[in-house]
Curated annotation (Swiss-Prot):
Location(s), subcellular: Cell surface
Organism per entry: Staphylococcus aureus (strain bovine RF122 / ET3-1)
Superkingdom classification of source: Bacteria
One GO location term (cellular component): cell surface
First and last residue of the signal peptide: 1-26
Source lineage: Bacteria, Bacillati, Bacillota, Bacilli, Bacillales
Recorded name of the encoding gene: emp
The protein's name in its UniProt record: Extracellular matrix protein-binding protein emp
Keywords: Signal
Amino acid sequence: MKKKLFVLTMSTLFATQLINSNHANASTESVDKNFVVPESGINKIIPTYDEFKKAPKVNVGSLADNKNFVASEDKLSKIADPSAASKIVDKNFVVPESKLGNIVPEYKEINNRVNVATNNPASQQVDKHFVAKGPEVNRFITQNKVNHPFITTQTHYKKVITSYKSTHVHKHVNHATGSINKHFIVKPSEAPRYTQPSQSLMINHYFAVPGYHAHKFVTPGHASIKINHFCVVPQINSFKVIPPYGHNSHRMHVPSFQNNTTATHQNAKVKKAYDYKYFYSYKVVKGVKKYFSFSQSNGYKIGEPSLNIKNVNYQYAVPSYSPTHYVPEFKGSIPAPRV
């Protein structure tokens, strides 16, 4: 009888551990970014978690092996110094202001903010991982010096992190730099700072700018071939280029730019003249963040161009009323999509 009871008890424990293990794995895989949130606020940070109690408990000692995780509030206090926090937390994480002193001791007085001068590397002040307080983000954080995503408070996290359900939420940035390596939208008031095509070529990922300033620093079509990801669009239409899940295609008009302007890529030394009157239609191919194809005809028939888009660095753009031209990386001719 004792032997049967022992076997039954062990079986129950094993099944419980297996369920917890599977649940923990599923939960951490559902987290899109790398960050720590308090257990009580998880449903505010990750919309897909409707019940924060389902989040797995993790020990501080195991955080280094688990990049995507959720920490309970009592564990946050054990992350005492910024160097340890930056090692344990791989990149992005979110903490409430009440826990600020436990994560970054330099900012124990959360109301006593400091200004970081443009010529003063912010990384020396906050060790790359730091907390920003909502509207004050642009005041004391120098974007062109910091090359990692920063921490924000729960109430303002949507300004920094693209939410799970709203794929068109982005953050604003103030400086053109190669250090900014995430997708963003430029505010109209900041657009004049981007004055040369070479500045846009430094940006590693996809971005959007107001249409009436675009011609000052990016050559449409040409730039979208050369930049690693997709092309320039007006800020008000940015959600049409990155549509929410469930939307197949959107049409947008990119305003007229200076006609017959010749642009030179600083690396490939390729010169092409384009008429900058574009109509685009995009279709989500593989998720929201990467591959798009052009729709043809009058927007109702979805078609992909006859080439491997991997050969042209993901996305490319061509004028809708232009002759056939060449994509340098592809080394072949492609027709301009008609919409």
